[in-house]
């Protein structure tokens, strides 16, 4: 049984990522990160030689498109506090199934604090290109994103998988957005469970792997 460590980021819903902690895993350290938590997880993977990394909706660089979305979120915050931030975020962070749900939106909004939102915005606005950290670990990597993620569209995840030094798998899940581990919890848990146990890389005839 390995050790699972979580890096939930600053905008995770109050439920967090604790539902991953009981999954069986191979020996070694297994790091599970959401959004900007990917950078902290990669640094730990580099320092401690993690066996695997699960990156959910990873954010490792800021480009002009992401900067424009951050500017809109900051404008919402400055105009109407966390409520304004949440209203702008509703269109960016949620997939089509969740965006219309007042219950899901209220649960996420409840976990926001002005201090936390400002810290997140400052971190994101100061982000450069941190993909180089992917070259610092040979841990196998699983990237999971929502196909309807308007904040960090699937090409961000493709970049992560392409930059990975070790083995990498990438999945996009339909009907989910940026908050994919909560919007598509069952599907994400199934993928992560197979990955942590090593099932995602079973050897096949001819030297291939699943």
Indicate residue ranges for each PLM-predicted region.
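Short beta-strand/loop motif that positions the catalytic acidic residue
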Residues: 137, 143-145, 149
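Acidic beta-to-alpha connecting loop that harbors the catalytic carboxylate
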Residues: 10, 147-149, 175-177
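Conserved alpha/beta-hydrolase catalytic His-Asp/Glu region
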Residues: 64-66, 82-135
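Catalytic histidine-centered segment of alpha/beta-hydrolase-like enzymes
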Residues: 176-189
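Conserved HGGG/HGGXW glycine-rich cap/lid loop of the alpha/beta-hydrolase fold
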Residues: 1-25
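Catalytic histidine neighborhood in serine/cysteine hydrolases
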Residues: 162-179
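Flexible "cap/lid" loop of the alpha/beta hydrolase fold
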Residues: 46, 53-80
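Conserved alpha/beta-hydrolase "acid-adjacent" motif
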Residues: 150-156
